[in-house]
């Protein structure tokens, strides 16, 4: 059994992160001063400057958003990991008719957008 399979067996919600990785997402672990993992951040860059971002603190504490080329939030969701990832995976690509484009607000300062 691989490390990924072992982790998913212990925490089935982690399969959702594997789904994102297979959809082209990149991830960055965030640690505290002692090297302990405090959260996981993920990003997927789109042509035209759009980007989707994910922050996971725990399986019940996650947030996702999409920003446009100006860093303005056009979609966001908070909740459990599965709920947020499902939202991100079903979100139409930015170039697709019906994709969110109406600005909801500015992205939080310090968000990692490639």
Stretch-by-stretch model annotation:
Residues 14-17, 51, 86:
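Generic N-terminal initiation segments characterized by hydrophobic and/or small/turn-forming residues
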Residues 1, 65-69, 109:
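Generic alpha-helix detector with strongest preference for long hydrophobic helices that associate
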Residues 1-46, 106-108:
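Negatively charged, low-complexity tracts enriched in Asp/Glu with abundant Ser/Thr
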Residues 40-42, 54-56, 62-66, 90, ...:
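Generic preference for hydrophobic/aromatic residues in regular secondary structure cores
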Residues 18, 25-28, 69, 73, ...:
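Generic detector of bulky aromatic hydrophobic side chains
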Residues 70-114:
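Mixed-charge, Lys/Arg-enriched low-complexity segments
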Residues 49-78:
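Intrinsically disordered, low-complexity regulatory segments enriched in Ser/Thr/Pro
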Residues 45, 57-60, 111-112:
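Ribonuclease/tRNase effector modules and their secretory precursors
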